[in-house]
Amino acid sequence: AKELAAAGGAGVITPDIIPEEADAWVSATDDALIDRVFLVAPSSPQERIEQVAQISNGFVYAASTMGVTGTRTSVSVDARALVARTREVTSQPVCVGLGVSTPEQAAEVGRYADGVIVGSAFVRLVLDAESPSQAAAGVAELAAGMAAALRTARRGGQA
């Protein structure tokens, strides 16, 4: 956590640390003033959502679906209900990720979540690029498309 803070990092999404085993991590992130973000899933019981919301700071990551990260053709309908269940127990932002890979999906999620998390779609662009400049252009284009779709969706329009 200290090294991350020294490098300019502000927070970490921790998919592989469970709250019951996070005491050392919580202490380290508190000392380093680093936000820690834990995940809730559609299968999480309400008690677990409360526990995750209490230990997270920065935001709560609502996984749109069960499983591993990666691009998908659609965002699970369970995500909206999970955001609502999480908002019942926290005032922190609730952001949705796992499977968001297109501007249309980002707009859909942006209509009910506080934030949209995109990872694999950007990684795929970088890995598939033939050069660093092509990777940068692809990432910039996707980010701009998602931002525009989110702005339109937040104003009540269609992406």
Segments from the language model and where they lie:
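Active-site-adjacent beta->alpha loops and helix N-cap segments on the catalytic face
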Residues: 14-32, 45-51, 69-84, 103-106, ...
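Glycine-enriched alpha-helix->loop->beta-strand junction motifs that scaffold or abut catalytic
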Residues: 4-10, 30-37, 54-60, 112-115
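Short beta-strand/loop segments at the ligand-binding rim of alpha/beta enzyme cores
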Residues: 29-39, 87-97
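Active-site beta->alpha loop and helix N-cap motifs at the rims of alpha/beta catalytic domains
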Residues: 1-16, 150-153
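C-terminal helical cap(s) of enzyme catalytic domains, especially alpha/beta-barrels
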Residues: 123-156
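Catalytic cores of alpha/beta
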Residues: 44-54, 96, 100-116
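Surface-exposed amphipathic alpha-helices with a cationic face
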Residues: 5, 26-30, 83-90, 143-154
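Glycine-rich phosphate-binding active-site loops on the catalytic face of alpha/beta enzymes
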Residues: 11-21, 60-70, 99, 112-131
